[in-house]
Every structure is written in C-alpha cells, then in structure tokens.
C-alpha cells in the first residue's frame, strides 16, 4: 500500500538514504521515500504518480503492468487458442477468455462493440442474427461460413 503523507520531521529515504526534506513523502513497505525515488524496477515509472498500489516479488518493487507481465497468470484465447499476456485487456463470456480482436461472431466474424448483444451457444460466440437462425434449425448445428 502506498500513502502520501505531509512530512513532520525529516526521515531517511529508503531509495537514496538521504533525508527527506520535501513537504510530502511516500510511505510504502513500512519505509519512507522521496517521490522521485519510489520507482518500478522494470520501467522506472514513478509509483506515486501511477496510483496507490505497488507490487513486490523477488525483491523487486513493481508497477501493476510489470508485475503482471513478469509474474501474472496467462491463459489461452478461447477463439484462436493463442497465449494471452497477463497485462492484455480481454473480453470474457462465462469461463471463456478472448483477445479483444478475437471477440467476434464465430460464424460471420461480426465484431462486437461495447453494449452489443451476443450469445454463447455450444461454446461459440454468436451475433443475434446467427443465434436466431440457428434456433430455427432443428438440432442447432451451426456451420462455419
């Protein structure tokens, strides 16, 4: 957890070991930091500017993106079966996870926008038109076009 606190008396910075004379300081991992000293070990972004959360593992202090990139759980896209990096934005339908580019009707390839209605039938993502056409067929066995 990261917190910004007004400085009441000078404290030593865990990053540079110098006294913190700034008006504000950061407290993270039960240590005090200059705003410029608390950085992600990978991308060097200032963690006080990124948000109020930081991640630690293997003696590294990391931003969310780099933590997920290095240690996050990845999975495979339900449509293309390719690996989805842990930091990538995804779409979900029940237990299935998809790349944003793969989240489309699996019969006509119509891409979905936020708020569009879609259907999951026999583990396939379908647009409303293809879903309704499939319901009209006996036994519903869609053929990929």
Curated annotation (Swiss-Prot):
Coiled-coil annotated residue ranges, if any: none
Protein name as catalogued: LIM domain only protein 3
Domain called LIM zinc-binding: residue spans: 11-73, 75-137
Keyword set includes Hydrolase: no
UniProt keyword list: LIM domain, Metal-binding, Repeat, Transcription, Transcription regulation, Zinc
GO molecular function: DNA-binding transcription factor binding; metal ion binding; transcription coactivator activity
CDD domains linked: LIM1_LMO1_LMO3, LIM2_LMO1_LMO3
Any single biological process term in GO: negative regulation of ERK1 and ERK2 cascade
Organism listed in the record: Homo sapiens (Human)
Tree of life domain: Eukaryota
Single GO cellular component term: nucleus
Xref: SMART domains: LIM (SM00132)
């Amino acid at each position: 957890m990261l917190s910004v606190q007004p400085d009441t008396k000078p404290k030593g910075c865990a990053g540079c070991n110098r006294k913190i004379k700034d008006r504000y300081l950061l407290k993270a991992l039960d240590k005090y930091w200059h705003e410029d000293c608390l950085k992600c070990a990978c991308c060097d972004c200032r963690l006080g500017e990124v948000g109020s959360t930081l991640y630690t593992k293997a003696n590294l202090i990391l931003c969310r993106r780099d933590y997920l990139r290095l240690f996050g759980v990845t999975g495979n896209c339900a449509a293309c079966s390719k690996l989805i990096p842990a930091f990538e934005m995804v779409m979900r339908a029940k237990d299935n996870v998809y790349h944003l580019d793969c989240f489309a009707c699996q019969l006509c390839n119509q891409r979905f926008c936020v708020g569009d209605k879609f259907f999951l039938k026999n583990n396939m993502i379908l647009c409303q038109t293809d879903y309704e056409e499939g319901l009209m067929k006996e036994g519903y066995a869609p053929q990929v076009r």
